[in-house]
Each structure stands twice: as C-alpha cells, then as structure tokens.
Amino acid sequence: MNRTERAVIVWKPQPRQLEFMRRPEPEALYGGAAGGGKSEALLIEALRQVHIPHYRALILRKTYPQLSDLVDKSQMYYRRAFPEAQYNATSHVWVFPSGAKIWFGSMQYTKDRTNYQGKAYDFIGFDELTHFEWDEYSYMMSRNRPTGPGTRVYMRATTNPGGIGHGWVKARFITPAPPGTPIVETVTVRLPDGTDQQMERARVFIPSSVFDNPALLANDPGYLASLASLPEAEKQALLYGSWDSFSGQVFTEWRNDPAHYQDQRWTHVIAPFAIPKHWPIWRGYDFGFSKPFSVGWYAVDEEGRLYRIKELYGCTGRPNEGLRIDPVEQAKRIREAEQNDPLLRGRVIHGVADPAIFDESRGESIAAMMERSPHFLRWQPGDHTRLAGKMQFHYRLRFAPDGRPMLQVFSSCKHFIRTLPNLVYDESNVEDIDTRQEDHIYDECRYVLMEHPISPPEASAAPPRPDDPLELHRQARFYRI
C-alpha cells in the first residue's frame, strides 16, 4: 500500500460500544434502551479472533427468522473487512481465510439446547438476551470453552428490558451492582483429592441508549421522537432503559417507593409492623421440588386489606432453581418458621394451597405427607381459576384516592418484590401470565387472594409523580433500578 493511501474504515465504535468491547470479564451485558448500536457491537466483537484458525464463535437469537437482520449486517461488515470470507446460507456459518468460523444459531425451545451438546465455542454472543430463559443461557456457559490454544473464552450479550427472561437477566446483571462495576461471584469447586477450592467469575453490565449513538441520531433525527411517542411502559424501557417498566409487563400497577414505606401511601412495599392479635393470618403454598416452593403468610385487617408479612422461598439462589427437598422437609421448615417468628408464634393460621397437592393418583398425596406427625400441617385446596385470580391481583394493586392499595408487602419479603413485577404475558394465551417464569410466589398469593375476593374498585388512582424539574429521577432509573 502506498504510504499516502488510507485504510478503509469498515466500522468505528461509538464510545459506549468501545467501553463494552474493552471489558475483560467472562460475561458482559450491553444494552437497556433501544438504538445504542447493540447488535453491531456484538457482531464486530465476534470478529476479534478470526485470525486464529481453530477459533469458533456462535451468535444466537431466539428463533432463526429473528437472525435475518444480524445476517444482513454481517454481510455488510464481514465481507468488507474480509473479502475472502465465505458465508454458507445453508449452515448459517461464516468461514474466514484462516479457517476460523462464526455460526448463527437459535434456541426456540429449551430442548433445542441439545443441538449444541458436545460443541465448543470460544465466543458465544446472545442478541436480545431477555428472550432466553436462564436454563438456556446457563447451558451455553458449559459450551463456552477453548477450541485450541491461544483463544480467549468469553460470552457477550445484548438486550432491551422485557421478555420471558427479564427477571433473571435483571437479577444477574442489573440489580447486584451499578453499571460498569464488576459483579464477582465466588464458587466452591471440590477437587479430586477432596479439598475445596474457591474460585471467582465476574460479569458486568454496560448500559446504552440512543443518546450514546450520535451517528443514528444524525442519520435519523426522527427516531428519538418515535421512541418518545411510544406508550409509557415501552417508552421508559426503550428510550430510558428502565428495568422497572417494560412492554408485556403484567402488573404495571406495581410500585416500590422507599420514601413511603412508613406512611404506606402510593407504594405496595411497606415497612414491617406489629400485627394486631385479632387480625386473621393466612398461609399460601405452592409446592416445588426442582423448581422453588413458595410459602407466604398474610395478615388481614379490618378493611379486608391483605399484608404479606413473611415468606419462605425454597430456591438455591439461581433463577427458578428449587432446593429439591421432599414435602416432609418442607413441612418441617414451615412449622419451624411459625414457631420461631414472633409475628406467627401462637397464632391460628389458615392454610390454602395448590389443589394439585391433594392428588392421590400416584400414591400418598403431598398434603397427606405434610399433615402427618410431627408437623401436622394442614391445607385446604385453593381456587385455581387462573384469570379470576389474576384479576384479584389487579383489583388489589390499584391505589385508592387516599393512596392505599388492598395488598401490601413487608419490605422483608424480598422474593415477592423481585419476582412479581417481572412477570410477563403468555404470547399464546394473552390474558394469562407466561408460566415458564418464576411464578411460584404469584401462584401461592393468588390462592390467598381468591379466599378473600373483592369487587373491582370504582376508580383507579395513579401515584403522583415527584417534583423533578431536572429529570434527575428519570436519569437515575436508567442507570440503576
């Protein structure tokens, strides 16, 4: 090349894209809002090691039709950067001059993960991560391994808020730390000699929005106005990157405002308080083994308002993963909670549970096992009418003109607070929630609500917005929810 000639720039990262691509962590999530150049950053990142002959990469979307835009963009960038590279449309794979390969794949159903069994990829990228379930993502972590010497092994993902995986993605990447701060998880590995070794794995979230993509705004000045004109939930998610409000969210009424924990106005989450002795106590239960089991205790005041005052959630700490303990052990833990907690000790407690625990078609029922000595835990079958139960949630979450809803939750009930606002609608049964989610707390609460049905409120009130002339609250929502 003549010294006066200049190399053609195929693609130049925006500052936030560059920040994402420079991260050293084994896992990184890029996104939040729309228009930040997420897909381009993922596509270009996959090229980092194509000079290594044995390098193998995989870029995933939920379904193959959704891959079309990514493939089109790869045709534009990859072919210009590597003119000799070839794309096989049948196998959905790019083959580079060195022999390196980048595949495009999908995982429409969780069972499709077995298509990648026995495979190894140095780089795995997920586009629109919230469209995937935790079991799908975690399985692919086992496929993320070196294909030969000298490769860097890591995973990258992009996404907007919303979708079936919203809850686990938020819990894994958004909630634990501020954006750009590494989230370090310590795990214990049992070695062949019987000793335990502590190991660490890090991940990070890098936020992006249309404001980080001046090239897009310059090319399409109207795009910003398009995002701003969306319905409120979609606008908050796609324009400002809010993880509290998103399209497809079932319980848009939900509010968690620490400023009102004490006065109990305009918030569903409140500070714990002593329960009067004359208030009835109810216990809801949803059985789980490989999935979490859920127990919630509720107090009922004179006005019929329900308070979730305590919970026992049988999960491992990983999304939607149960403790795998039998009904008798679950009964033991429930009874211990009621004997040791001052809010529950000595109280008459009414139990209502999923009717499925009374099934005797395969032997002794779960309900019978729990009722045996020494725990003597008794249940009555709950009303399992799904849509009616969902509507009871909506009725009770609405705020009255004085700012009080008919269902409130103690701030100590962390799993309720985590899971309920993340529930999304089922795409095929659009009036009901998607049951593939972590819906166990929702179910046990629904059984209790159906024991205390209320009529639809005559008028619904919305919580007042705080005085925020500089929109500082809105900006804070973008960075940390």
Please place each PLM-identified region on the residue numbering.
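Pre-P-loop entry segment of helicase/translocase ATPase cores
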Residues: 1-26
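Walker A/P-loop NTP-binding motif
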Residues: 39-53
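Conserved RecA-like ASCE P-loop NTPase motor core of nucleic-acid helicases/translocases
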Residues: 55-67
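Inter-Walker segment of RecA-like/P-loop motor cores
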Residues: 66-122
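Walker B catalytic acidic pair
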Residues: 127-128
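ASCE P-loop NTPase helicase motor core
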Residues: 131-213
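ATPase catalytic-site recognition across NTP-hydrolyzing enzymes
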Residues: 212-287
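Mg2+-dependent endonuclease catalytic cores in nucleic-acid-processing enzymes, primarily RNase H-like
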Residues: 296, 304-437, 453-460, 464-465, ...
